[in-house]
């Protein structure tokens, strides 16, 4: 059992480890857990036994899919590590982990520098204002180059990297690390990296070490006037002053300290842990988060364990032993096991049965989780990702939720046997609850079950999990593009549903104004009824009728998005009006409005990055143009070229195979969803004809 750390917010670090798909992030996390004493044998990813990757698919594919939270201890500090996936299809996982962590380690492959997915992760960290340090990993690999990492961080990320360490030896002779802040060097006495030896800086590295120490002092002087004065007078600042200044610059998002090592060869990981303690923020170092009261007033929430409870649910997982786990971060107050909480997002009361602190695959039960801490709750039934929990009697605030990107790819799925039918719908519902970017719907015309997700890999993994975890066999159709429909001009319509045939009639009558909204706005409903021309209790029914009818647009039956509907007039009948009648009136009105509003089809546009040797560049660009791509730019990367483009998803199916044959297997690409846009006229006609 590791030492218990007395609760002290200053000594808490909530960090994520983020990276491009093969930069060695899971290995780095593994090593951190090994050195902090929570794992007794190191698991290698390429042997398929890493601790953080605890779903079977991850072990097979060697990629990390679900963000697990793991607690470990280092130098009297508690470190909660939120593991984040590096594959593009799982960006929601990265988004939601960024939302609840305070700092991050971004891992780069030293032989590759900054890769496309690292840029995505970096942009997400910028968006959530997460301070970060960088780890140049794989320093023992052929082609490893610290300066490539530094240069690409400046050029591609616009970062201000600060060299904190220099390597001793390079590639396969990489044998130690120079700490330029403390002017000390370290080498390793054994392969496990547990025997670190401090040595004097080798003669041949002294000049370089002094040069970078000097540069580091200059950077530190930007954040501390004392250092500035000492620097100008030729005095040497103390180690504590330098650490404090670099810490301040990092937390203020002005600089990114860069550390190096080889996680696989156990070098540099303990020094990286020291850096987490030295330079990444505690919950007290970051600005308080904002919440909204029911009256719409914005309030600040401070990390005070004695304050009112406020927590955010950031992940749901189905656990084979305890059922549903809700991962939360407590922002204020203290959550105790056995207590009741109020979910302000849903307006429901829930009971906290047990609280767990997680290791990657085992767990300890705890009595309470205090402000700043992360853990899992057993017993919550209604709470989903992005919901806010407050104390039963605490002020009702709602914390800003987590943005969920729209799924862009649809696949029809059907059970192989009658027996699988019932199990399939239950299993899909469970998976959709766990992963907000995965949706399940029924095709309005064909009645088929459609699953939608962020990419082909995402859906493959879902189907895989159906088979393994839920023992459901299913046949899957070909992936289809998730088109959307919208209008291009504002319209005014009315919907009247009146039936008077003996007995009780039906009467619902609404007038709505429908306007197009900018891309990505979704749906906005405004109730502008005054003087009770439609009674209050029927308004939700009108909205429901509209939303249901929007599930299937007039052109090709895809959902209608990006519109604002204002309900401004109508009438009702004392006896014959009902919720049903108003629901139908709403749905009739919106159908007519979309027909009249010059409807268009929208398609998902992907941001695509193709890396190809120079000699195939012409072919690759020609091919992207033929796929209706819009080339955004090119840049050399090593001896290859990187082409960036926007390309419609519809044109990207099977691209991997085509690219391989065009570049004789040397080209590679990544793509992620960027935005929806109108399809060209001739494409729209073709889609409508193909119905």
Swiss-Prot record:
SMART domains: EFG_C (SM00838), EFG_IV (SM00889). The keyword GTP-binding applies. GTP binds at residues 19-26, 83-87, 137-140. Keywords: Cytoplasm, Elongation factor, GTP-binding, Nucleotide-binding, Protein biosynthesis. One of its GO terms (cellular component) is cytoplasm. It is found in: Cytoplasm. Its main location: cytoplasm. Residues 10-284 form the tr-type G domain. The keyword Transmembrane helix does not apply. It holds the Pfam family EFG_IV. GO terms for molecular function: GDP binding; GTP binding; GTPase activity; magnesium ion binding; ribosome binding; translation elongation factor activity. InterPro entries: EFG_II (IPR041095), EFG_III (IPR009022), EFG_III/V (IPR035647), EFG_IV (IPR047872), EFG_V (IPR035649), EFG_V-like (IPR000640), EFTu-like_2 (IPR004161), G_TR_CS (IPR031157). GO terms for biological process: ribosome disassembly; translational elongation. Catalyzes the GTP-dependent ribosomal translocation step during translation elongation. During this step, the ribosome changes from the pre-translocational (PRE) to the post-translocational (POST) state as the newly formed A-site-bound peptidyl-tRNA and P-site-bound deacylated tRNA move to the P and E sites, respectively. Catalyzes the coordinated movement of the two tRNA molecules, the mRNA and conformational changes in the ribosome. Belongs to the TRAFAC class translation factor GTPase superfamily. Classic translation factor GTPase family. EF-G/EF-2 subfamily. NCBIfam families: EF-G, PRK12740.1-3, PRK12740.1-5, PRK13351.1-1, small_GTP. This is Elongation factor G. It comes from Thermus thermophilus.
């Amino acid at each position: 059992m590791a030492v218990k750390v007395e609760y002290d917010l200053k000594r808490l670090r909530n960090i994520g480890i983020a990276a491009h798909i093969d930069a060695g992030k899971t290995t780095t996390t593994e090593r951190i857990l090994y050195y902090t004493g929570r794992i007794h044998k190191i698991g290698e990813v390429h042997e398929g036994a890493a601790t953080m990757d605890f779903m079977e698919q991850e072990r097979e594919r060697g990629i990390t899919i679900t963000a697990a939270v793991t607690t470990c201890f280092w130098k009297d500090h508690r470190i909660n590590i939120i593991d984040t996936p590096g594959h593009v299809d799982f960006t929601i996982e990265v988004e939601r982990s960024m939302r609840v962590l305070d700092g991050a380690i971004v891992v780069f492959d030293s032989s590759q520098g900054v890769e496309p997915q690292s840029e995505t992760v970096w942009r997400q960290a910028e968006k959530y204002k997460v301070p970060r340090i960088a780890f140049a990993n794989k320093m023992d690999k052929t082609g490893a180059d610290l300066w490539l990492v530094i240069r690409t961080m400046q050029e591609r990320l616009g970062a201000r990297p600060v060299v904190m360490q220099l390597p001793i030896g390079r590639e396969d002779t990489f044998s130690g690390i120079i700490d330029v802040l403390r002017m000390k060097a370290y080498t390793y006495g054994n392969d496990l990296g547990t025997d670190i030896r401090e040595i004097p800086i080798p003669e041949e590295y002294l000049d370089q070490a002094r040069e970078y120490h000097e540069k580091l002092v200059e950077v530190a002087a930007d954040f501390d006037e004392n250092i500035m004065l000492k620097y100008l007078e030729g005095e040497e600042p103390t180690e504590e002053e330098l650490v404090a200044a670099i810490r301040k610059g990092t937390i203020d998002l002005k600089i990114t300290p860069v550390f190096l090592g080889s996680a696989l060869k156990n070098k540099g990981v303990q020094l990286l842990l020291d850096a987490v303690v030295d330079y990444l923020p505690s919950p007290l170092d970051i600005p308080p988060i904002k919440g909204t009261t029911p009256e719409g007033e914005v309030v600040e929430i401070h990390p005070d364990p004695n304050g009112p409870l406020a927590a955010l649910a950031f992940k749901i997982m189905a656990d084979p032993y305890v059922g549903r786990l809700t991962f939360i971060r407590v922002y204020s107050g203290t959550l105790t096991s056995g207590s009741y909480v109020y979910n302000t997002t849903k307006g429901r009361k829930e009971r906290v049965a047990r609280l767990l602190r997680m290791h990657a695959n085992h767990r300890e039960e705890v009595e309470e989780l205090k402000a700043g801490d992360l853990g899992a709750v057993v017993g919550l039934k209604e709470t989903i990702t992005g919901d806010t929990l407050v104390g039963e009697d605490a002020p009702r605030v709602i914390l800003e939720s987590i943005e969920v990107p729209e799924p862009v790819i649809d696949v029809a799925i059907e059970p192989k046997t009658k027996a699988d039918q019932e199990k399939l719908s239950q299993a899909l519902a469970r998976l959709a609850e766990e992963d907000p970017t995965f949706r399940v719907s029924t095709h309005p015309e064909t009645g088929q079950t459609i699953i939608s997700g962020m990419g082909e890999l995402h859906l493959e993994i879902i189907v895989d999990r159906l088979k393994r975890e839920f023992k459901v066999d299913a046949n899957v159709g070909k992936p289809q593009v998730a088109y959307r429909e919208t209008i291009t001009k504002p319209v005014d319509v009315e919907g009247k549903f009146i039936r008077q045939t003996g007995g009780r009639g039906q009467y619902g009558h609404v007038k709505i104004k429908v306007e197009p909204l900018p891309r990505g706005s979704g749906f906005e409903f405004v109730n502008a009824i005054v003087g009770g021309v439609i009674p209050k209790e029927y308004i939700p029914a009108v909205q429901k009728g509209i939303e249901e009818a929007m599930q299937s647009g007039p052109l090709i039956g895809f959902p209608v998005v990006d519109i604002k509907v204002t309900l401004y007039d109508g009438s009702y009948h004392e006896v014959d009006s009902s919720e049903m009648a108003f629901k139908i009136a709403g749905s009739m009105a919106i159908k007519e409005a979309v027909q009249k509003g010059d409807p268009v089809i929208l398609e998902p546009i992907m941001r695509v990055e193709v890396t190809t040797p120079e000699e195939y560049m012409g072919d690759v660009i020609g091919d992207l143009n033929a796929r209706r791509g819009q080339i955004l730019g090119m840049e050399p990367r090593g001896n290859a070229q990187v082409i960036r483009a926007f390309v419609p998803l519809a044109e990207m199916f099977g691209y991997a195979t085509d690219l391989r044959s065009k570049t004789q297997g040397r080209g590679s690409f990544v793509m992620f969803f960027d935005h929806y846009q109108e399809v060209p006229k001739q494409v729209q006609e073709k889609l409508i004809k193909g119905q």
